[in-house]
Design a protein with these regions (language model features):
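Short, Lys/Arg-enriched, disordered terminal segments
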Residues: 1-11, 37-38, 146, 178-179, ...
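Membrane-embedded alpha-helical segments of integral membrane proteins
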Residues: 2-34
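Hydrophobic alpha-helical segments of integral membrane proteins
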Residues: 6-14, 59, 63-67, 235, ...
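Short, aromatic-rich membrane-interface segments at the entry and exit
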Residues: 24, 39-44
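Structural signal for the C-terminal ends of transmembrane alpha-helices
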Residues: 30-38, 55-57
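Hydrophobic membrane-insertion alpha-helices, especially the h-region
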Residues: 43-57
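A structural signal for short, hydrophobic/glycine-enriched beta-strand patches
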Residues: 53-229
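Periplasmic OmpA/Pal-like peptidoglycan-binding modules at the C-termini of bacterial envelope proteins
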Residues: 219-239, 243-245
Length: 254
């Protein structure tokens, strides 16, 4: 338990340190307060360059395409879809669900279920916080039942607090229910798929990743040259995943 907490805290600190916005702020502060004044213009120019690079949609898209898992699942059907948590706020409850920007994984799951591509839905995840008692999987299950998904088609794993535990506890749940020989479609956000798939491949489950087709490249002038503030956040998320992936490699989780 202590090791889990230390690993969790260290990963959060490291995630903050690789945030491009953090780098830009540091460079701007150096441009204002560096003792050697002749270096201040260099820091300012560096900050401007980083701002342009990390707010450029085309640069981000090209980089992300290299990171993204590619998989064609057309016309395949699966016994169950495994839906990873991380799509609601810690302030959520059964009566008041606050979805975040990662709710695409839930929408994709619903679409796949109603198309008959997945027969059952396994929801995995408690919360990504050591201090929260939130059981995200239970909340999502209640939501799915309210919107018409049959209760018997939903399976919950509500103990895991990170991607590694998602894989471990999901495998245990499937073995308990004698589902470990099923075919599974792994459903999460695209940026998170590489680490998730690697964790689940370490289990004995038959896993296939669900990946949507990439967006077409835009050639309008605004997309190509106008900086986008939301892209800074996308870079933060991507760097967090890259760091998380290699930390998991170091720990032997993937």
């Amino acid at each position: 338990m202590i090791f889990t907490k230390v690993f969790f805290i260290f990963s959060k600190i490291l995630s903050f340190a690789v945030d491009p916005f953090f780098w830009i702020i540091i460079l701007l502060l150096l441009a204002l307060f560096a003792k050697k004044k002749y270096r201040r213009p260099r820091y300012l120019v560096s900050a401007l360059i980083l701002t342009f690079v990390f707010s450029s949609s085309p640069i981000y898209k090209i980089t992300f395409e290299y990171w993204k898992i590619k998989q064609d699942i057309t016309y395949q059907k699966f016994d169950a879809g495994i839906l990873l948590g991380g799509m609601i706020s810690l302030s959520s409850s059964d009566e008041n669900i606050l979805f975040n920007e990662y709710n695409d994984r839930l929408l994709n799951t619903l679409e796949l279920f109603h198309k008959g591509i997945i027969k059952k839905i396994i929801i995995t995840g408690a919360s990504g916080s050591l201090s929260s008692d939130l059981k995200e999987a239970d909340i999502i299950k209640s939501f799915l039942i309210r919107i018409g998904v049959p209760r018997e088609k939903i399976i919950v794993e509500n103990q895991s607090k990170n991607t590694h535990e998602n894989a471990i506890y999901t495998e245990l749940t499937c073995k308990e229910l004698e589902m470990d020989k099923y075919s599974f479609l792994l459903i999460t956000s695209d940026y998170h798929m590489r680490r998730s798939l690697s964790c689940f491949k370490k289990t004995g489950l038959n896993i296939t990743p669900y990946v949507k087709e990439s967006d077409e490249f835009h050639f309008d002038l605004e997309y190509l040259i106008v900086p986008q503030t939301n892209v800074l956040f996308k870079w933060k998320v991507l760097f967090h995943e890259i760091v998380g992936y290699f930390m998991y490699k170091l720990m032997g989780y993937v």
